[in-house]
Amino acid sequence: MRKIVISALLFGCAVLAGAVSHAAQDALADDLTPISRQDWNAVRAAHLLERAGFGGTPDDVARFTAMGPAAAVKALVDFSGAAQADANRHLLPFDESGIHDPGLEPFPTGRPAATDQAKATGEALGIKVKPTGNRRMQPVVDKFFYWLRASRLETDRLAYWWANRMLTTAAPLQEKMALFWHGHFANNEEKVRDYRKMKRQLELFQAKGTGNFRDLLIGAAQDPAMLAFLDAGVNVKGAPNENFAREIMELFTMGVASNGVANYSETDIREAARAFTGWNYQDLSFKENADKHDGAVKKFLGQSGNFDGVQVIDLILGQPATAEFIAAKIYRYLVREDVSDAVRKQLGAELRNNRYELAPLLKKILLSRDFYSAPSMATHIKSPVELAVSTYKKLDLKEVPGVPDFNDATGALGQRLFHPPTVAGWAQGKSRITPGLLLERGNFARDLLFPNINFLPPDRYNQDETIRIVSSKIDQGQDVSTATKPEGKGMGGGGEAMQSMSTAMADRDEDFNTRYGSFRGWQLATQKVKPIPRRPAQLDLAGLVRSQKLLNATQVVDYLLARFIPLAVENADRARLVDFLKNELGTDDVVQAQSYLEEPLRLLLHLIMSLPEYQLG
């Protein structure tokens, strides 16, 4: 079976690239008029659920088919109200571990900054330096590493919480657009170093992600996670830092150029940077330091005035290029990679004419004939998060499995929530389908269907070899200096006595031990951060087959293909799947094989999920 899977995955690179690059044209392409009720069917309803959410079960597809296109799109876009709130009563707030304390603020830029502060003031991170004795600043160092480790682990829990919302929400477009904005306003926890700020930013995307773009943009620009990520604190009067202004203009609003014409100049960036001087944050709040703001006249995008940051944002929103840039990026996310100039201009006008309200734009896109055209359907290569959540959805799971680990699995595929690689977000499209990544996608399916009995929870088992070695040596009773001595540095022979003497001296004289602090930080973090539940996927494929009254291998294969694949597979692939199932069952009679049906079905589904067509949505 492994040989079949690998061959399919490697061949799939060419198949997927061809499917995305050479999708057939039809009369619906680039037509933004609404699709009619007469043209509505189950295939298009399933397509809508895939793109505006994370897919659906056959029951979901049947319900949206019966609604018709206008009602179906309205239900997805207009998700606020009492009925929707009632449908989402099961969605609980994030269950905090309670790991933060006020002494952590403001968190130092690094370990040296923490110990320098402790040395200068006698206190840092809410911890006082010991008056006398060995390693007087060790508790400060321990606290520093504790917060780094605890915030990372709590962020992983936050990602699980969000993935469960994606899976079970009655408002899938809310979470789908939150995922879009997370990649658009891309900040990562490694730089922000505070899960609370990442959580606040996610809540902003969930609350305003389908509302008014101006409100969302100002909220994101003044968000503590964004300000921390883009080093806003160093942007002050007399020494403006252009990084913040450049990212807002280049990545978040206008784009560098439209049709080869620059949308702004380097002078515009410098002047915008002056307008943003004084913007900073304090803990979880936006803070505007008036004494650090440049209040002089600025010249920006052809306008002159004493502009502040919000006024600069409004000037940016007044540019036609901004509405077109945002509308086109949303189109590429929901529809397809290539957007024609005509469509870009129409959608930009739609957004601008509605004063940057996103809901009318989303309705226009999702109702358009273009959205259901051949170039748009089954041509989107699913992101790792889309792949994982849509897989859980099609399996009708009620919770994200703990095995395999959701964060590690999606990270191996190239997308770990709250950890985008750059401020530009994650790679899109064909970059997701290298041979190595396709093999990882097959491995994800395998680990989901056949959980690894040797699985070690990454939030409990430290994967840093150095920390594991230190932990082992401490458990053996070694003193701190000996336990933290780098491996392979022993002198041998008589040098051991000299090393013992130097170790003893170090134990007496050092102010702190960084390696011990790193170990102790992990130890404290795992004590305080709540563990991620590790229940594997609760599957009953045999029960599913029985409920559908499927009698032979061909019926089983056709049912599973229809449920999991958005387009028809090659006849030869279908025939191989049927033959595979017959061989595993030892018969074509599914009823006769009831007592041992589950494992062959899981093997079959692994093959289906490893097909190149399964990567498309």
Language model features with spans:
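Positively charged n-region of N-terminal signal peptides that target proteins for export
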Residues: 1-4
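Bacterial N-terminal signal peptides
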Residues: 7-17
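Sec/Tat signal peptide C-region and signal peptidase I cleavage site
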Residues: 19-23
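Active-site substrate-binding loop specific to GH73 endo-beta-N-acetylglucosaminidase modules
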Residues: 27, 127-147, 151, 155-163, ...
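Extracytoplasmic
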Residues: 43-44, 68, 221, 356
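A mature extracytoplasmic/lumenal domain signature
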Residues: 53, 65-68, 179, 220-222, ...
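N-terminal accessory alpha/beta regions
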Residues: 56-208
